[in-house]
Amino acid sequence: MSRFFAGGGSDSDSESSSDSEVVARPAAPQFTFSDEEEDVKRVVRSTKEKRYEDLSNIIKNIRNYKKIKDMSSMLTSFEELTRAHTKALPVITKVENGVTPRFIIRALAELEDFINMVWEDKEGRKNLSKNNSKSLGTLRQKFRKYIKDFDSDLKKFRESPDAADDDEEEEEKKEESESEDEQHVAPAAAKAVSFKKEVKQVKVEKDDDESDDSIDWDMDSDSDESSSDEETQYTSIRERFLKKAEKDDGEDAENKKEKKKLQKDSKDRLKKKRAEDDDEGWEVVNGNRSTSAEQPKMFAKDAEIDVNVVINKLNEVMAARGKKRTDRKLQIEFLRELRTIADTHNLGDAVAAKIRFNIVSAIFDYNPKVSEPMKLEHWSKLLEEIQALIKLLLANDDIVLSETILEENEEYETAPYKIRGCILTAVERLDDEFTKLLKECDPHSNDYVDRLKDEVTVSSVIEQVVKYIERLGNDTETCRVYLRKIDHLYYKFDPNVLKKKKKELPASTLTSVDEMDRLCRFVYAKDQTDRLRTRAILSHIFHHALHDNWFQARDLVLMSHLQETIHHSDPPTQILYNRTMANLGLCAFRHGNVKDAHQCLVDLMMTGKPKELLAQGLVPQRQNERSLEQEKVEKQRQMPFHMHINLELLECVYLVSAMLLEIPYMAAHEFDARRRMISKTFYQQLRSSERQSLVGPPESMREHVVAAAKAMRHGNWNACSTFIVNKKMNVKVWDLFYEADRVREMLIKFIKEESLRTYLFTYSNVYASISVPYLAEMFELPKSKVHSLISKMIINEELMASLDDPTETVVLHRSEPSRLQALSMQLSDKVTNLVDSNERIFEMKQGNFFQRGGNQGYNRDRQNYRNQNQNQNWSGNRRQDNRENRGNRNQNRDRDHRKQHRVEFEEKAE
């Protein structure tokens, strides 16, 4: 408004001119016009500038959204960025020769770091809103898919992230040149420059030159003076818009040269000042720490370095351990510098061991959350420090590192050296960190394999600690370190054990079974706590079962009586017990002990949660069955993937064992109403298959077992073995066994035997006699084996028959009742049970109603009546008497007797 009305005094006028400016304006022209329309030229931008500007604006928005963690807006901006980059691809291909600009790669790298940081912060993710949480998952998924095309560019950027972006440098130079051109325009044109341009000009000059404010103020005052002079020098509008003289152009060129010279001089003065500041010893202060006094100071240049000075400085550094504002990374750096100083002045191995032990402790403290694993760079440094510390302790016999030594009793100058600390605790924590690192990795990725390679290093560290602890002679610590060694040994299969059994190796060869036996026997003898002994026994059983030492493993289980007291143990020990019983069941199955295998696995499989009981994963639960805290604790107990037991193999062994036991039992007790299920899980699978209206060919492992069970019920061993042993089942289950061919042969032999028993139970009522050679031919078994099976059935009274040796036949003496007869007997038994229960209910009601003295006489008379009725009517055959006693006549008579006795009882009571 001030540009158009001479007398106006608005805010814009005050901004464009100085506050102290007082100008007398002529009264003739009541308004003036701005030169902005004439002086500002239209700028034609190239396609590259347009596309790059769009990308820059989107990247700027993404950085703003990162500050406030607005995931929804960030997802929208990322989609806009992908579309803008697609539009800019022709320009990039033409101008940049297909190389993606560095500022785009920088933005993608920053976004990747931000997404990973937010995703790893599990507590922070829980606090996000539902919309932001959903947008984070979608953004992470889309970004990981989109970033694959920029892998090589990102890798190069990660190598040198601090390098400046080429496009940004060009833009800065361009802006600087534009700002110089704009600030040196003629006084009449300077008035038309917008406020936005002025701010940008000052900012560029501040960033580039960081000069004093006086230069800018001089420039502003010059421009204001020129504008005021311009407004006063014209008396009419016509003179104001006339073309300027040529001499003005010469004056403007001279003004430009002078101002450029002033700017160059200011830059030189600034560089000189910075150089002087660097010479004076200025240093950059970390903004995270409030004061520099919190940092422990190293020694002065002229200080005398000895053992006491170094130990005091070490105590000073470690005194800040655990405090709120302690920089853990800086603390580790100070300790390493202190170790370097101690090595330089040759202060001895004892001081070096003390410092290294404190470095190990500081690395452990670097990770504040105990439930989360440490970073990989800290893990590698931790391994190096512990290996160097143990090597130092083993090389010096006169250094004793123990937690029983008090701080005032430490000795660093004269042998024997005494240091307070516990190397065993450090190694135990190292082992726990290794387990957490494994559980954090994806088990199906190469990262897990890379981390698993560190187990060789961890095992060697434990071996070295075993040597050191054995040298100290402390039985308690020896048991603890032995158990750590057992934990890394018990689940590993050693083929030399089986070769030694087959006498392919000399008897003096030491195997893992011999090593386990030595370690566990020491723990059995010296341990003072039940937990270590229990875990040693379970690990010993597991290792024996893994190498098919069935009898040794079984005897250890029976002698230890762990199954009676294991429910009092801690959860990790109970998990180890479940793993041991599962492996023992597999061992029993490999040895052909089907019943023992079923007994070992039944408690584990009947719950329906073998995955959780073996700590191999969590099954999704219904609402409110497991809280977040419980789920977090249970996830910490999970076993690493390489220690898992194949659940499909375990379930198949259990179902096959149940089939070999349940099908003959069902055939033998088909019409028995009091039949009990041997395996509830197998019975449910069988019943669910029978309820299906249409059953197709088997596909899964369970369907194969159910189809085999149905074939066995009819005595068809060939179809049963085909369903159990085939190409698909071999790949899924049987090829996972050691010596799989032997297991398959044993399984087919058992199927033949149990199919024979099922056939005899099912069809014995059809035959009067059966030929033994015919049975041997039908089931492809030797005659001796058929003879043995039938003899056992006759001895156990499972089959009412006799063997005729001259004719080699089985003579059946009594046939089983028909189906109608069996159902009739079941009905009579159920009716009998119903009547007895009704009588008991009636007696309870009568006893509650009549609570006076005549109650005893009534019960006595009723009991006499029942005894008399039993003596008269329940003699002879039980089934025939049951049918007669349940007739209408007996029911009426019993009812009359009850009424008569009730009347007599009431008369007595009155």
Swiss-Prot record:
One of its GO terms (molecular function) is RNA binding. This is Eukaryotic translation initiation factor 3 subunit C. Residues 641-817 form the PCI domain. Component of the eukaryotic translation initiation factor 3 (eIF-3) complex. Residues 162-181, 207-232 have a biased composition (Acidic residues). Residues 865-877 have a biased composition (Low complexity). Residues 1-10 have a biased composition (Gly residues). GO terms for cellular component: eukaryotic 43S preinitiation complex; eukaryotic 48S preinitiation complex; eukaryotic translation initiation factor 3 complex. The keyword Protein biosynthesis applies. It comes from Aedes aegypti. Keywords: Cytoplasm, Initiation factor, Protein biosynthesis. One of its GO terms (biological process) is formation of cytoplasmic translation initiation complex.
